[in-house]
Amino acid sequence: AYQPIVDLRDQSVFAHEALVRGVAGEGALTVLDQVTEDNRYRFDQLCRTRAIEGAANLNMQTHLSINFMPNAVYRPESCIRSTLEAAKKHNFPIDRLIFETLESEHVDNYRHLTNILREYREFGFKTAIDDFGAGYSGLNLLADFQPDLIKLDMALIRDVDQDRVRQAIVRGIVTICAELDVTVIAEGIESAGERDFLADCGIFLMQGYWFAKPAFKALAQVSPEAWTR
């Protein structure tokens, strides 16, 4: 499935995030419960190649954001090779691929993770830290590696327009990222109030049900009402 990430500046779609779904449309948790140590690498590779294939078949003209599992990547160059082959096969531009890693995912070796991210960047992929603020390691990871993008966790976003503590945290993250030249994406937007507060903070890339739900094997349309302030 694909969910749009919108750009409020010109009311366009900046990217689509590829989300895991089962063959019958089962949710991500149902699918991920079947992932084991034995099939983790194969699953990770299959997800990224299927995401690229699906995007090409849908004639996606935006960036494509793909989640990857750091613990499934043993040799970054092997994963990159298969990704490059998939992109070439389906004629999808390399510079429109974004790879997201979950800040909340337990990673045993952070040097390994930062090496993966650096190698991805060297090959022309954009990098992102997903669910930023959900775990305890986000700032440490940001200190070691500055991705192109971070995605604020929806727990920070929920009712942020009514919560002074969350507002202060979000403003602080935006300030830090501005100094580091890291673009902020707010995910999990579910209300006009959340959208408006975040826009006033200078966040222009957003994702969430307020704009569009994920579409299975399709590109979701953003309702015109979603933009109106």
Predicted regions and their residues:
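Distinct, well-ordered alpha-helical segments
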Residues: 74-88, 108-116, 138-149
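Generic structural signal for well-ordered alpha-helices
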Residues: 48-52, 80-87, 114-117, 170, ...
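Signature for phosphate-centric chemistry
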Residues: 24, 66, 131, 153, ...
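EAL-family c-di-GMP phosphodiesterase catalytic domain
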Residues: 7-12, 102-107, 136-229
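Short beta-strand/loop segments at the ligand-binding rim of alpha/beta enzyme cores
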Residues: 116-129, 177-185
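Bacterial c-di-GMP phosphodiesterase EAL domain
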Residues: 1-90
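Non-membrane alpha-helical structural segments and their capping/turn regions in soluble enzymes
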Residues: 41-45, 77, 110, 114, ...
